[in-house]
Regions:
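Active-site loop ensemble at the mouth of alpha/beta enzyme cores that anchors a bound cofactor
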Residues: 75-87, 187-200
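Internal alpha/beta scaffold segment
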Residues: 1-25, 96, 103, 109, ...
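Short amphipathic, charge-patterned alpha-helical segments
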Residues: 1-5, 152-168
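Glycine-rich nucleotide phosphate-binding loop and flanking beta-alpha elements
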Residues: 80, 156, 182
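Terminal amphipathic helices with adjacent charged low-complexity linkers/tails
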Residues: 13-33, 55, 167-199
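Hydrophobic alpha-helical positions that pack around
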Residues: 26-152, 164-166
Length: 200
């Protein structure tokens, strides 16, 4: 997805910013990038296409505020992770004062599917108010932890039972939504789906 986005805007470098709190993720991504290089899918004149593209993996020490795009850019540049005044916007003057597109991994993960199947097909996925798909991370509290992509509107119980293969230990509640998420008691799980409507 990042390579396709880079091609669309004429970029030759994609920066993968991964927080240091996730060392295993950093290593997995570095191995994936090395594998792409070994297969000739990144670098100069990729597969004789005339297209150049490289990935730079950054193990970031940034604080939570670095989730904001301009604070993230400051962190990558080795500066304090503080929000920048706008304008200029990153697309005008971003990383090292060059035009920069900033997206999260979930957005970029959708790009290949959208390119292959079309935006209209992607918009038909999900519910009326929550289109597309979502990435769901299941931790070691599940029998089969991992990251899964599900269509918006998928019942939360189905995610737990079919993808996570149930809980690995007795569970009273789930923490959903990352640092700014909430605690959901097990009695509410069957009323929820992976969408914006049921979580309001």
């Amino acid at each position: 997805g990042m390579m396709l986005a880079g091609f669309c805007v004429g970029a030759d470098t994609g920066v993968l910013y991964i927080r240091a709190e996730y060392p295993e993720a950093v290593e997995i991504v570095k191995r994936a990038v090395a594998d792409l290089g070994a297969r000739g899918w990144i670098g100069t004149n990729i597969q004789g296409s005339g297209i150049d593209f490289r990935f730079k993996v950054i193990k970031a020490a940034g604080a939570y505020v670095c989730g904001e795009e301009t604070a993230l850019l400051n962190s990558i540049e080795g500066k304090r992770g503080e929000v920048r005044t706008r304008p200029p916007y990153p697309a005008q003057q971003g990383l090292f004062n060059r035009p920069t597109v900033v997206n999260n991994v979930e957005t970029l993960a959708c790009v290949p599917w959208v390119v292959k199947n079309g935006g209209a097909a992607f918009a038909k996925l999900g519910t009326d108010k929550s289109n597309g798909s979502k990435l769901v991370c299941l931790d070691s509290g599940f029998n089969r932890p991992g990251m899964y992509e599900v269509e918006c509107g998928t019942p939360l119980g189905k995610v737990i039972d079919e993808l996570g293969q149930g809980f690995s230990r007795p569970t009273k509640a789930l923490h959903i939504g990352g640092p700014l998420g909430g605690i959901v008691p097990m009695s509410r799980i069957n009323a929820l789906s992976i969408d914006f409507e049921t979580f309001q």
